[in-house]
């Protein structure tokens, strides 16, 4: 067997672990020694995997008010938003997993072998018709951006938005005024389409695809007659390279994560919450708490990856539970941006109506003239959740 290399940090660390074990066995403080050994193992994991960082507390309290004061300070200059289907439901676009109203719960008419098949690339290549029938119902351009979308735009206008990472394929972030450089469309977009034939890959515009979908004709490549698919990421396909390149550059310098309308169940998007420095505060605006730490991994590796809202060690994670639009209004109110946000939504919706020739607003995105919900202290959040249920 090869001799240990003293220059190898893993060998050195392993030797120290053995020394700690030997020392512990000779003392009456075995419990204390065991704790020291666990601390050492945590350090070993974090150093070896490059996960170590200082757990500095930057929020003076773990509430929406605490997040607001931090956002108004000099420490908060770069905000990343991580968003999912929950920010678009008030525009009339269903999310995926809600038991009765979610997309997966309403696919019986397509006679699929299982709900997820409609977004599997292998099934799509053989049976594209169900996807395009669904796409007609959900096609971008039929919906208006929500208060959440315009709150993200307001972050951009205030010079605070570093990037918006979205799981959504509805392009409403673009409609709301975000530029391509502001976005990472992690699960792709309807903005462009390509032939699925790998030897062809001809590109098509959003307008071309829309015409095909609304004529109820399966889009076929004009060169090779293969199916043309919007550039959204199906199960079994890789995420866009931009997702990984931006992740590497963005998360080392982020000052605040705002996570909205996502179950944080789909990887690798869900793992983004663990990419920020351990001191970076994280605000969740959602109907329920998501993304919590696995207790065993948290103990063994000292990871700050999962969200920790309730333990005694919580120091940076805040949950505002309720409707995402109302959460954005509550935060905007505390920041002194509420009127500006409401005016922006009304003005942009009026412009969309004028361009489409329609004067009927989306009822679910119409702003109530009443006061926005109070900032979410735990008791208020719990009461709000119970009322919704």
From Swiss-Prot:
Residues 378-389 have a biased composition (Basic and acidic residues). It is found in: Nucleus; Cytoplasm; Cytoplasm, Perinuclear region; Perikaryon. The modification Phosphoserine is found at residues 23, 25, 53, 100, 368, 372. Residues 57-338 form the Deacetylase sirtuin-type domain. It catalyses: N(6)-acetyl-L-lysyl-[protein] + NAD(+) + H2O = 2''-O-acetyl-ADP-D-ribose + nicotinamide + L-lysyl-[protein]; N(6)-tetradecanoyl-L-lysyl-[protein] + NAD(+) + H2O = 2''-O-tetradecanoyl-ADP-D-ribose + nicotinamide + L-lysyl-[protein]; N(6)-hexadecanoyl-L-lysyl-[protein] + NAD(+) + H2O = 2''-O-hexadecanoyl-ADP-D-ribose + nicotinamide + L-lysyl-[protein]. Disruption phenotype: Tissue-specific knockout of SIRT2 in Schwann cells of early postnatal mice leads to a transient delay in myelination, a reduction in the nerve conduction velocity and hyperacetylation of PARD3. The number of dividing Schwann cells in the developing nerve and alpha-tubulin acetylation are normal. Mutant mice embryo grow normally and new born are healthy. Embryonic fibroblasts (MEFs) display reduced cell proliferation capacity, centrosome amplification and mitotic cell death. Nude mice inoculated with immortalized MEFs from mutant mice developed tumors. Induction: Up-regulated in response to caloric restriction in white and brown adipose tissues. Up-regulated during cold exposure and down-regulated in higher ambient temperature in brown adipose tissue. Up-regulated after beta-adrenergic agonist (isoproterenol) treatment in white adipose tissue (at protein level). Up-regulated in response to caloric restriction in adipose tissue and kidney. Up-regulated in response to oxidative stress. Up-regulated during postnatal sciatic nerve myelination development and axonal regeneration. Down-regulated during preadipocyte differentiation. Inhibited by Sirtinol, A3 and M15 small molecules. Inhibited by nicotinamide. Inhibited by a macrocyclic peptide inhibitor S2iL5. Inhibited by EP300-induced acetylation. Residues 353-369 have a biased composition (Polar residues). One of its GO terms (biological process) is cellular response to epinephrine stimulus. Gene3D superfamilies: SIR2/SIRT2 'Small Domain, TPP-binding domain. The active site is at 187 (proton acceptor). Binds 1 zinc ion per subunit. NAD(+) binds at residues 85-89, 95-97, 167-170, 262-263, 286-288, 324. Phosphorylated at phosphoserine and phosphothreonine. Phosphorylated at Ser-368 by a mitotic kinase CDK1/cyclin B at the G2/M transition; phosphorylation regulates the delay in cell-cycle progression. Phosphorylated at Ser-368 by a mitotic kinase G1/S-specific cyclin E/Cdk2 complex; phosphorylation inactivates SIRT2-mediated alpha-tubulin deacetylation and thereby negatively regulates cell adhesion, cell migration and neurite outgrowth during neuronal differentiation. Its cofactor is Zn(2+). Residues 1-34, 350-389 are annotated as: Disordered. Isoform 1 is weakly expressed in the cortex at postnatal(P) days P1, P3 and P7, and increases progressively between P17 and older adult cortex. Isoform 1 is also expressed in heart, liver and skeletal muscle, weakly expressed in the striatum and spinal cord. Isoform 2 is not expressed in the cortex at P1, P3 and P7, and increases strongly and progressively between P17 and older adult cortex. Isoform 2 is also expressed in the heart, liver, striatum and spinal cord. Isoform 4 is weakly expressed in older adult cortex and spinal cords. Expressed in the cortex. Its EC number is 2.3.1.286, 2.3.1.-. A motif (Nuclear export signal) lies at residues 41-51. Keywords: Acetylation, Autophagy, Cell cycle, Cell division, Cell membrane, Cell projection, Chromosome, Cytoplasm, Cytoskeleton, Differentiation, Meiosis, Membrane, Metal-binding, Microtubule, Mitosis, NAD, Neurogenesis, Nucleus, Phosphoprotein, Transcription, Transcription regulation, Transferase, Ubl conjugation, Zinc. NAD-dependent protein deacetylase, which deacetylates internal lysines on histone and alpha-tubulin as well as many other proteins such as key transcription factors. Participates in the modulation of multiple and diverse biological processes such as cell cycle control, genomic integrity, microtubule dynamics, cell differentiation, metabolic networks, and autophagy. Plays a major role in the control of cell cycle progression and genomic stability. This is NAD-dependent protein deacetylase sirtuin-2. The lineage of its organism: Eukaryota, Metazoa, Chordata, Craniata, Vertebrata.
